[in-house]
Amino acid sequence: MLQWLAQLHDTFPAFNVFRYITFRTGGAIVTAVLFVFLFGPGIISTLRLKQGKGQPIRADGPQSHLLTKKGTPTMGGLMIFSGLIVATLLWANLSNLYVWVVLFVTTGFGLIGFYDDYLKVTRQSHAGFSGKARLAIEALIAGIAVVLMINAGRAGLSSSVAFPFFKDLLLDLGWFFVVFGAFVIVAAGNAVNLTDGLDGLAIVPVMIAAASFGMISYLSGNVVFADYLQIHYVAGVGELAVICGAIIGAGLGFLWFNAPPAQIFMGDTGSLALGGLLGSIAVATKHEIVLAVIGGLFVLEAVSVIVQVISFRLTGKRVFRMAPIHHHFEQLGWTESQVVIRFWIIAVVLALLGLATLKLR
């Protein structure tokens, strides 16, 4: 919205800064973090009052969780989502289709997560929204988003998969790209959801991934930088850097309250929304495969669950002491803070590897 002030630069020369994505990204970070700082305590108090017993804690999980996490309210994703939306509406170019597509996915996945959290809290059970129904709705939302991005993009590129390390290698999937793109978005949403099991564990890697994709969006949406780095230029995606900035700001504000011992949990409301958002930005910028590197921690968490389930069904034995894998390390004797900080370090390393693919071609 504030981007339109740049049109008044002849009268107010200082307003020219609103043209620049970098300036507006910084504004989005500051706006989102201040919003969450200001309204976070009130949201937490309201959720604690409404939820009573808070998020149900897994009885088969680490016993320390039953003591330290019991009674903590969930749906903290509402704080992140609110800060993200306010900052994006203020600082992004609202005539940009990609902005609205990403917000559509974020809102849709957030609503699914909210309903799932609501069922878990009211029933005081981990049996929330039906898994099949949830995946079906997520796939529908993601599919619509991918179709919109294909129609908005450049023919021959928007329906293609780009490969890191190869500057000219494109695999055009045609309309099958809708299935591929929807899978990326849904997988990202649920992978982040599985990662959100310890205080601060998910939000920091999400911010790291957002910072990485903020740079990727800016570079991919700038014809000069895209040509220099020999990555695929996608007109308009640079504006998604503003949304990435809003994620970082809202995430920093949320982490203030989610740092151990957490005053609030993100819940599916936040984790599904943020994962879907990252997935949709990856699809928009043509960096779907790079997402698997930058978000490798989320992939690891998701794969650990898949391996555990398949192994138990086929052999009756578990590969890990507990899945997702962060609980496995807790069972091995790592403290919660050790797991969280070490996983943060992994997220940083993977993000650097992912960003390196922009230059190594």
Swiss-Prot record:
It is a multi-pass membrane protein. GO terms for molecular function: metal ion binding; phospho-N-acetylmuramoyl-pentapeptide-transferase activity; UDP-N-acetylmuramoyl-L-alanyl-D-glutamyl-meso-2,6-diaminopimelyl-D-alanyl-D-alanine:undecaprenyl-phosphate transferase activity. The keyword Ribosomal protein does not apply. It catalyses: UDP-N-acetyl-alpha-D-muramoyl-L-alanyl-gamma-D-glutamyl-meso-2,6-diaminopimeloyl-D-alanyl-D-alanine + di-trans,octa-cis-undecaprenyl phosphate = di-trans,octa-cis-undecaprenyl diphospho-N-acetyl-alpha-D-muramoyl-L-alanyl-D-glutamyl-meso-2,6-diaminopimeloyl-D-alanyl-D-alanine + UMP. The keyword Cell membrane applies. It is found in: Cell inner membrane. Coiled coil: none annotated. Its main location: membrane. Keywords: Cell cycle, Cell division, Cell inner membrane, Cell membrane, Cell shape, Cell wall biogenesis/degradation, Magnesium, Membrane, Metal-binding, Peptidoglycan synthesis, Transferase, Transmembrane, Transmembrane helix. GO terms for biological process: cell division; cell wall organization; peptidoglycan biosynthetic process; regulation of cell shape. Catalyzes the initial step of the lipid cycle reactions in the biosynthesis of the cell wall peptidoglycan: transfers peptidoglycan precursor phospho-MurNAc-pentapeptide from UDP-MurNAc-pentapeptide onto the lipid carrier undecaprenyl phosphate, yielding undecaprenyl-pyrophosphoryl-MurNAc-pentapeptide, known as lipid I. PANTHER family: PHOSPHO-N-ACETYLMURAMOYL-PENTAPEPTIDE-TRANSFERASE, PHOSPHO-N-ACETYLMURAMOYL-PENTAPEPTIDE-TRANSFERASE HOMOLOG. GO terms for cellular component: plasma membrane. Belongs to the glycosyltransferase 4 family. MraY subfamily. Its EC number is 2.7.8.13. Pfam families: Glycos_transf_4, MraY_sig1. Pathway: Cell wall biogenesis; peptidoglycan biosynthesis. The chain crosses the membrane at residues 27-47, 72-92, 94-114, 133-153, 169-189, 200-220, 237-257, 264-284, 289-309, 338-358. The gene is mraY. This is Phospho-N-acetylmuramoyl-pentapeptide-transferase. Its cofactor is Mg(2+).
